[in-house]
Every structure is written in C-alpha cells, then in structure tokens.
Amino acid sequence: AANGNSMALTYSDTLEDLVSINPAVSTKESGEWTKPEVLTSWRTEGKSETVNSVDYASDGRLKVLAFDSAVYDSDIDSDGNVDSKELNATFNSSEIHVYVNGKHTTLTANNVADMAPEVAVNNGKAIVVWQSDTYNLADTDAETLQKDMMGEKKICYSYYDGTDWSAPAYLERGEIKGAQAYDVALSDDGTAMVLATMGSSEEVQERELYSYIVKDGAQKSVNRITCNDAGET
C-alpha cells in the first residue's frame, strides 16, 4: 500500500515462520526505497501472531498504517497441516490495529474475525474501515460458515479526529450485510465516503453498490447506488 514517497507492507527477515511477519514502512529516498522499518510494538508477549493485510495513507503530516493480525497455533508452522477448526480459530482471533505517526492502537478486541482494513487520511483526520464476521467462526458448523462466506460479513469503521479513535461501529448498524469489496475516501472537512458492494445472496446479480457518508465520526446517510440484475463487484 503506497502513498507518495512512503508505503506499507508485510515484511519478514527470515520467512522461517508466520510469527516473523510484521507490518513495515519504507520511504523513497533519491529514487530508491529504503529498507523497511519493521513495527513490532503491537505484539503480545507469549502469543504466536502474524499479519494478514496492511493499508497505508498519509497527508504529509499524518501517517496512518492499518493492519489485521491473527493468533495461530505454532503447530501450523511445524507440520504444515491445518484442519478447519484450527483455521476458523485463527480467523476468529483477527483484530484491527493502527499506527498513527508511529503510535500503536488496537481498535478491536472481540470474538469475531475483523479483517482487511482500508484507510484514508486528510487534513489531520483519518478513517479506517474493515470487514467483520457475523459469527464466531470457531463455534459454528460448516453450513453456517458457508453462509458467512456467501455474504454475512458487515463493514465496520473507526474515525480519528486528530487525537483519538472512535469506538468501532457498524455502517448502517450492520443491517446491510454481505461485504464483497469496499474503499474509503476522506475530504478536507472530515467527511468520509465509503463505497461498497454488498449483498447477502450467493447469487452475484443480487449484489448492489452502496455509498455511506460519515461526518466527524457519525454516520449521516446510506444510499443504494445500483438496483439491477448485474453483479456489482
């Protein structure tokens, strides 16, 4: 995830195991990218944690890196075999983290999978959106898990006002589910727009495009942009 002369990435010095993967930031100097600055202060001592995805944005003054982490059984590294229960437990442990100008904050701490953050920054403010599962994946059966994958995921967000992050909240209170893809932009006055393809049906043509407006951390409106038989993805 690049923004101007800086970018964020997942980085490992060794690639020997999942726990060696961390978020990192590299900057461009004289046309060359520097060796990534690896961020490790997010880790919990005694836990095997890894990073799945990162996003990054900056307005020059404010630099925000967002990522999701997961706790996994260290046996996964040793035997290479992962059963569905282990995998679900790993996903279920996923949480959202942010670094603001190098300062770490954990945004979520719950019993559902929070994954794939997207971040926007403008004029000293920021917003992060991510997908959140409806179910506790570790305690659900195969049929419910399939339903979840078909479209039960919701979109959450947290807003940074220049000092603090707001408590995570669902867009549209979670009533519209089935997050397939999403992106976010932030204007100079602190108004954010989230654009998402949503739809809880397993049929692609049932998915539609929605926009959400968030002003100073509070959701103001939701609009259904499409209503047709085409699959907006």
Predicted regions and their residues:
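Extracellular, repeat-based ectodomains that mediate carbohydrate processing or recognition
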Residues: 1-233
